[in-house]
Design a protein with these regions (language model features):
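Non-catalytic signal-transmission and effector/linker regions of two-component phosphorelay proteins
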Residues: 1-16, 22, 26-29, 46, ...
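Acidic di-acidic motifs
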Residues: 19-20, 65
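Alpha-helical interaction/dimerization surfaces of two-component signaling modules
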Residues: 30-35, 51, 119
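Acidic, metal-coordinating helix/loop segments flanking the phosphotransfer/catalytic sites
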Residues: 41-61, 65, 69-72
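Two-component signal transduction core modules
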Residues: 62, 126-127
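Hydrophobic/aromatic residues positioned on beta-strands within the core alpha/beta folds
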Residues: 106-107
Length: 168
């Protein structure tokens, strides 16, 4: 066995980190960059959807918070292709765009508070906040080394109505 072989798969991977909490986003971004990953960051779903739609290179992993702020009302005179939605909808839209096939969903909500999102959280890798840097890195490496997810499973799909046009 070569003692100089990397312990994990190639770190030449791109990760998109989405979290509205600046301190949590900073911890994730700094940790992942220090490990050699290329890291894109977004403070919310609108920004993350724009990155997913416009970034030219593959995004190997989407690390997103479950509870991203959404507006109470999202109506204006022009359609917004990058609406503010929760993290589970960001995942569903990322898969629909075929921009990533690996995700980690994170949240500070307890298991009981997440019950309404169980269809999603039971089908994707989940990171409970607060978490250690070691736990983050271990899960990131496990997910990148695993088979890509498929969102053909209707239980894991977003509860968002695809016929609803988002404005705002």
């Amino acid at each position: 066995m070569d003692n100089h072989a990397p312990m994990y798969p190639s770190l030449a991977k791109t990760i998109l980190v989405v979290d509205d909490d600046p301190s949590m986003r900073l911890i994730c971004v700094k940790t992942l960059r220090a490990a050699g990953f290329t890291v894109l960051e977004a403070e919310g779903s609108s920004e993350s959807l724009k990155i997913l739609a416009t970034h030219q290179e593959p995004i190997d992993l989407l690390l997103t918070d479950l509870m991203l702020p959404t507006p109470d009302l999202q109506l204006t005179s022009t359609e917004n292709p990058y609406p503010r939605v929760h993290g589970h909808d960001v995942i569903q839209r990322a898969f629909a765009m075929k921009k990533t096939s690996r995700v980690i969903l994170m949240s500070g909500l307890s298991y009981h508070e997440r019950k309404g999102y169980q269809a999603v959280t039971d089908h994707v890798p989940f990171l409970q906040k607060p978490f250690s840097v070691e736990t983050l890195m271990q899960l990131v490496h496990e997910v990148l080394a695993s088979a890509p997810l498929s969102f053909d499973d209707s239980a894991a799909k977003s509860t968002a109505n695809p016929d609803v046009r988002w404005y705002g």
